[in-house]
Every structure is written in structure tokens, then in C-alpha cells.
Amino acid sequence: MKNTELEQLINDKLNSAAISDYAPNGLQVEGKETVQKIVTGVTASQALLDEAVRLQADAVIVHHGYFWKGESPVIRGMKRRRLKTLLANDINLYGWHLPLDAHPELGNNAQLAALLGITVKGEIEPLVPWGELSMPVPGLELASWIEARLGRKPLWCGDTGPENVQRVAWCTGGGQSFIDSAARFGVDAFITGEVSEQTIHSAREQGLHFYAAGHHATERGGIRALSEWLNENTALDVTFIDIPNPA
């Protein structure tokens, strides 16, 4: 498949053109024209690029790519080494950020809901769905369930939350700023990847459980699902590689 055809295929699947983002979605660094072997991962770190080189991949597809708004345009140090690895090995780099959070099937939010057994009921605002667990569970039990499913112990604050949790809102990655919207909507718990200092005060003062389950851990699902979709629907050879990250 041509590198530009792959870009169009995924853009169409994720409806990228309809979503404004903080970084370019699609082909970010051009490599060889023909793509067959692909490595995917959450972030285009040096470790992932090194794996792509080792596996002789033609392309790398990630959720967190390069060239973010507000980022320094200077190419030096870490950025130079990463780009040099791609260019020297003629590897294409593709990134899809918010489109891969929001997609109702392959998106990070949809995949997290499926993993945790949450039935999606609607959306509080863009990128913040809400839903229900099959039955009410104590806050500590939900924390244990999140740990079991994600392989990472979440930071849990349930000081003033209800005895049991059933109505849940969530936003994968760095979605802690949405806690107030979730509280106003009226859920028992809010799940995201990261926590800020003020997040805990918001949870305590508004009476809901809060879980910070890891930016990386909550965003493995989307890129993994996209990898599976490509393997099932094309003749491409796609391998998801999880580079461990406790954050």
C-alpha cells in the first residue's frame, strides 16, 4: 500500500477532517512510498522507533506523535535523534490524536469503557462520555477492578464519594480538567489518566470518586484497536508494541 493511501484510509475511518487538534493528524514524517510492515504504539518515543528499526518496519503509527502546537520548532537533542532515526531508515511516521480518542468503536474512550465493562449511555461534552456499570460497586472495589484490567494501580480519591459507584464519566489521558463537568452532570465517579493538585479538592468538595489510572495505561486501547482493524481489513502486517510507561 502507498503511504498516502494508508493515510487516507485511516483519516476516513477516524473522520479526522471533522476534528480540530493540537497536532497534525496523518502522515507527519514521510518515508518510503510503499508500506507493508507497520509498528504501532502509544507514543513515538525513541524506544518505539528503535523497535521499528529492529523489525525493519516501513511505518510507525502512534497516538502521540510530533509537531504539537506551541512546541519549539528547533530540531536538536532528543527531537533530532528521533527524526534522524526515522529519516535515516526511511520510516514513515503517522499520528492520530483526538480522532483516536473520540472514535465510537476504535477510540480510547470506547476501548476503556469496553475494558472496564461500562455501558456507554451518552456524552457530557465532546471527549467526555458517561455510562453505567452493570451493578453498583464500592469505590475501593472499582479501584481494584481498574488495576486488574489496566495492570496499573490507580490513584483513587473517594473521601466524600457515595458508598457505591454505578454512574461513571471518563476521559482517557490528560482529562482531569473535565472533573467539574462530570460533577455537574451528576455521576458517582470520574476516571481519567492524570491528576492535578486541584483535582483532588474538586473530587472531595463535589462528592464523587476520582481515579487517575495512568495516561499511558488508559490510552493503549485505541492504537491497539486500530492495529487490529488494519490487520483484519488490509493485507498489512501490523504489530502493536507496548513501551512501558508508569505515567
Curated annotation (Swiss-Prot):
Assembly and interaction partners: Toroid-shaped homohexamer. In the hexamer, 3 dimers assemble to form a ring-like structure surrounding a central hole.
Gene Ontology biological-process annotations: DNA repair
Q: Keywords assigned by UniProt?
A: DNA damage, DNA repair, Metal-binding
Q: Please give the function described in this protein's UniProt entry.
A: Provides significant protection from radiation damage and may be involved in the degradation of radiation-damaged nucleotides.
Transmembrane ranges? none
From the Swiss-Prot or TrEMBL record, give the protein name: GTP cyclohydrolase 1 type 2 homolog
Q: Which family does it belong to?
A: Belongs to the GTP cyclohydrolase I type 2/NIF3 family.
Would you name any one GO CC term? Answer: cytoplasm
A GO molecular function for this record? metal ion binding
Query: What superkingdom heads the lineage?
Result: Bacteria
Q: Where does a divalent metal cation 2 bind?
A: 64, 215, 219
Where a divalent metal cation 1 is bound, by residue?
63, 101, 219
Record flagged with keyword DNA damage: yes
Protein species of origin: Salmonella typhimurium (strain LT2 / SGSC1412 / ATCC 700720)
PANTHER family per record? GTP CYCLOHYDROLASE 1 TYPE 2 HOMOLOG, NGG1 INTERACTING FACTOR 3
